[in-house]
Amino acid sequence: MFNSIRTKVLAGFSILIAVMMIYIVYVSISNANETNEIEGITEEELPILIANYELANSINAQIAAAQGYLLTGDSKYTETFYSYVDIASKNADFILSTSEADQFKPYYDQSVEWRSLIDKDVFQAYDPDNLAIAYQNLLVLEQRGNDISKGYETLAYSMRDQITTSGEHLVKVGKQNLWISINMGVILVILAI
């Protein structure tokens, strides 16, 4: 009889250990996947989202700087314009080094051309005695700049939606893991009895 009880106890503990090992492997794999997804969000997706928003704002600030220059002729506005060009270049370099470069490149190319046209057709065309040409050029280029800004915003919204979807997935997986943990705890208690 002693061997029989001993065998049953060993079998019970073996089952408990096996169930615990399966649970530990599942939790480890699940946590590793969640960690990878969170790292993807924080290290790539979120910075891309921010960079696209900053690029959209940069275009708008460049338009405002060009308008300020035409209104006053003060070179501080051209300096402001080019400081935003530098900010945009840093953000663009970052995005071009990511997986989103293909979607981003057309807007980037348009913005580079747009900035050179602002320089040539607005800043260099500026003549205090005849502002009409520079104003007309800016009106045309302002609309183009707004379109580029909206393109960057569209990319940002797309990335925002992607982050939201990833977040919803992480919440779902977290709830599943909680449910599994509770059930596993109940099963282990029952097996231990």
Labelled PLM ranges:
Residues 1-3:
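Short, Lys/Arg-rich, polar N-terminal cytosolic tail immediately upstream
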Residues 5-60, 95-111, 145, 166-167, ...:
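Amphipathic alpha-helical segments and their boundaries
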Residues 12, 180, 184-193:
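Cytosolic-side ends of inner-membrane transmembrane helices, especially those
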Residues 24-27, 68, 192:
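Structural signal for membrane-spanning alpha-helices in multi-pass inner-membrane proteins
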Residues 27-30, 34, 58-61, 65, ...:
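Amphipathic, well-ordered alpha-helical segments in soluble domains
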Residues 38-41, 71, 78, 96-157, ...:
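Polar/charged, Q/E/K-enriched amphipathic alpha-helical segments with strong coiled-coil propensity
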Residues 75-96:
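Alpha-helical segments in soluble extracytoplasmic regions
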Residues 82, 93, 153, 157-160, ...:
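Non-membrane, extended amphipathic alpha-helical rods used for dimerization/oligomeric scaffolding
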